[in-house]
Amino acid sequence: MKSWFAFFYYLFIKVIGALLFWVKLGNQVTLLVSFPDNARAILKEYQKGHFSFPIHVLLTQHAKSLEKEFPELTVSVINEKHPLHICKAVFSMLNSKTVIVDNYFVLTTVLTSRPDIECIQVWHANGAFKRFGLKDINTQNRSRADIRRFRKVYASFDRIVVGSEHMADIFKEFFDIKGDTFLRFGVPLTDAYYEARENSNDLKSKYQLPAEKKIILYAPTFRDHQFESFSLPFSEKQLQHDLKGEYLLAVKLHPVMKESAELPEDSAWIKDVSDLPLADLLKMSDLLISDYSSVPFEFALLDKPILFYTYDMEAYNRTRGLIRHYTEVIPGMPCCDSGMLLDQLKDMDKLQSEVERFSREWNLYSRGNASKQLLSYVNEKSN
């Protein structure tokens, strides 16, 4: 049923694209957004006023908070399944010289018949531990029609922005990219980590976290239907005794996981921070514990230690899929229990040097001016 809906959805978009063949190419840029971070960085740079083209921002429901952040820009919130919204989005794209997207959108397939419109993919993460695209484990179970549709979407990307050669190689494999289509500008969302940083104690005060404690941020990846396996890296007892009461464990969960996870209430040692902005949490944290999430790629820009709590690595690799050589790529070693995590914490200098190596490799081109480089490139193409 799902495949049939996807087929008719794709067909509807193609029909709309054909019916709007008369739309003339304009000088505007359309920004199609599903995650706010890259778009926020791009729009902040755009507002500095150095660019000659108008911009139209199309926000999906997940990114609609940006509408309030940029009230002076032309911003529309769209429902990708609403026929009128689809027509509006396709019209805007066909009226653009450049279309910038941050995710997989079937909408971009209308651009394959319009070589005069350049589609630029600015992926919503600056690194990847999980397989996606054509190499996603679940893709093996999809029909040939589904896979052909996936390929048509990936083929619509004329350019892909990358922050490292590692990500360029991943896109080549996961999207089956032929040739060098990459813009080595760095990933826009990383620009924020080069701006003046708010004092960590000020941030702790803002969010009512104890100033005297160091913060361990635990930010695990989303787990599909595996809530029963959710595990905290440390217990309250370990935080009090093994870590000498110096740390607060701040837990940032995906909304779906938050509904099912049982976290201690009114604890002095463990606090649910799932509703707080990730960027602020990263800036105020002294240590990150994650697993297969892309969060470590951002946190590495802050030159702070990272631990990997991978208690379900084999099961996760079977059901979701990890990149090759995951255990060699991560800075440090995978830890399957809290005892291993505590052992790793004894050598902070080694953890720090591993993070520096990791960031050099994965944030090679992200140097604080990614948004400016991207918009300057688009500006030159528009003139």
Curated annotation (Swiss-Prot):
Gene3D superfamilies: 3.40.50.11820, 3.40.50.12580. Pathway: Cell wall biogenesis; poly(ribitol phosphate) teichoic acid biosynthesis. Keywords: Cell membrane, Cell wall biogenesis/degradation, Membrane, Teichoic acid biosynthesis, Transferase. It is found in: Cell membrane. InterPro entries: Glycerophosphate_synth (IPR007554), TagF_C (IPR043148), TagF_N (IPR043149), Teichoic_Acid_Biosynth (IPR051612). It holds the Pfam family Glyphos_transf. It is a peripheral membrane protein. One of its GO terms (cellular component) is plasma membrane. Its EC number is 2.7.8.44. Belongs to the CDP-glycerol glycerophosphotransferase family. This is Teichoic acid glycerol-phosphate primase.
